[in-house]
Amino acid sequence: MCTLNEKSKLDVAIDGADDVDTNLALVKGGGGALLREKMVEVMADKFICIVDESKLCKGLGPGFPLPVEITPFCHEHTVRVLENLPSIKGSCKAVLRMGSSSTN
């Protein structure tokens, strides 16, 4: 095992997803490690996502809340911007789920 700081590239990254639609678009990061997962995937030449049929859906969104990881810097502004996006204004509310704790 090694850390990502020790490698500049990975051959393959393997992970799961929270939701997968019929176009193979994914919702990931529901467990709270969105940024960490993305960093690993970006460093990999190949990304393999393994899911079972319980993760399949007709469209992303209704079955699983969209995870958005926000860093502490300028977090209040970021939440305001997200809450006021025209496509979701009034239909969603940002919920602080994990506070400032570190996960995974």
Where are these regions (language model features)?
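Conserved phosphate- and dinucleotide-binding cores of soluble alpha/beta proteins
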Residues: 1-104
